[in-house]
Structures are given as structure tokens and as C-alpha cells.
Amino acid sequence: MQKLTILLLVAAVLLSTQALNQEKRPKEMINVLSKGKTNAERRKRQCEDVWMPCTSNWECCSLDCEMYCTQIG
């Protein structure tokens, strides 16, 4: 009986996790669609100074990201 209870609890957790993942997918799709911005649109927002953490070049004022914004030159 205990094994059946544990099995039912595990199944409930798996189903609830799957439901949460399905709710997040529309937001991910919006993020994917918004990544197609031009450089001018990207520069409208604040850019990071030298030595600030970054994940891509367009986040830095220098447009040079190597885990941190670096200075060109």
C-alpha cells in the first residue's frame, strides 16, 4: 500500500511539472520573436559599461562581450 501511495505522489508531481512547463512556452515564444530587433532598437536601451557582466555583444556599449563588457582598442 505504501508503494502505491508513493507511486501516486510521484505521478502527481510529474504531471504538475509538465503542466507548469506548458504554461511557460508562450512566454518563451514571445522572447524568441522579440530577439529580431535591429541594432538601432537595441541601442535605445541602456548599455553596460566596461567590466559589467554580459551574455552577448549587444548588451555592451563597446559591442564587445567576453563574459564581461570589454573596451575596444
From Swiss-Prot:
Isoleucine amide modified-residue sites: I72
GO molecular function: ion channel inhibitor activity; toxin activity
Tissue expression as described in the entry: Expressed by the venom duct.
Signal peptide: 1-19
Any matching Pfam family: Conotoxin
InterPro entries: Conotoxin
Cellular component aspect of the GO annotation: extracellular region
Propeptide: 20-41
Keywords associated with the record: Amidation, Cleavage on pair of basic residues, Disulfide bond, Knottin, Neurotoxin, Pyrrolidone carboxylic acid, Secreted, Signal, Toxin
Chief site of localization: secreted
Subcellular compartments: Secreted
Residues recorded with modification Pyrrolidone carboxylic acid: Q46
Disulfide bonds: C47-C61, C54-C65, C60-C69
Record family assignment: Belongs to the conotoxin O2 superfamily.
Record comment regarding domains: The presence of a 'disulfide through disulfide knot' structurally defines this protein as a knottin.
Name of the protein: Conotoxin MaI51
